[in-house]
Amino acid sequence: MMENYKHTTVLLDEAVNGLNIRPDGIYIDGTFGRGGHSRLILSRLGAEGRLLAIDRDPQAIAVAQTIDDPRFSIVHGPFSQLAEYVGERNLTGKIDGILLDLGVSSPQLDDAERGFSFMRDGPLDMRMDPTRGQSAAEWLQTAEEDDIAWVIKTFGEERFGKRIARAIVERNRIQPMTRTKELAEVIAAAMPVKDKHKHPATRTFQAVRIWVNSELEEIEQALKSSLSVLAPGGRLSIISFHSLEDRIVKRFMREQSRGPQVPAGIPMTEAQLKKLGGRELRALGKLMPGEEEVAENPRARSSVLRIAERTNA
């Protein structure tokens, strides 16, 4: 079911500015969503510019297909495969910028039928692409208690992960859960301590969603792929919404900005050092949303934008 959800793109201008758009450049919007970033990129491109957008959500694809612009094309799939999409178009090493807006989008959260939200009752799904893979309900019904506990602790940073996992497994033995409200109620009942400022299901829903969609692996693969597709001087502009995402992006940009680490005292010739390769990226810093943006869109509060540039190495 698709409705007209109001969607405010977080750090819109800042993320696109980070790409340093050239009118004749070739760019990738790896998370089309509802098209906020893509439309702004297109507005800054000239007649020779190109934009390739990617999204694994069929609803996002439906929105993208309404854009009638010869400079624009859309791919239905995960952004982890961006190197493949670029290679198919003979654009490897020619991309001038990649933008990624990570995590779940507001339209996905706000549509109860997608099953992402503990605030709205809907099918316990949580897949960004409902046509592929296991739903959250299917995974929770078949996974071992220890595996569920590990996911909740690792991807939700939830200290009561074992207790919640036990409650989920016990409930599913009695009657399998198929609704988000059922899961939220089981989590709330299992929590020995309540956080006054956070719904008890927040961390567990995040963890299950990340696991079902392989979100962190997707990010890691996309970042690795970016090095092979970016042209020298090409930009990475990446928005994260929680510490697990941002940690991966921060570590990647830092490591690729440092170049190969050679232990002190090991003699190496200039030719050997050159063979190891130089810095792949130059980190250009991070930006956070201003007070005004957070006031208008509270979901922007935790967002972090990191920008890096491909070197000539």
UniProtKB/Swiss-Prot annotation:
It holds the Pfam family Methyltransf_5. It catalyses: cytidine(1402) in 16S rRNA + S-adenosyl-L-methionine = N(4)-methylcytidine(1402) in 16S rRNA + S-adenosyl-L-homocysteine + H(+). GO terms for molecular function: rRNA (cytosine-N4-)-methyltransferase activity. Its main location: cytoplasm. Coiled coil: none annotated. Its EC number is 2.1.1.199. Belongs to the methyltransferase superfamily. RsmH family. This is Ribosomal RNA small subunit methyltransferase H. It comes from Klebsiella pneumoniae subsp. pneumoniae (strain ATCC 700721 / MGH 78578).
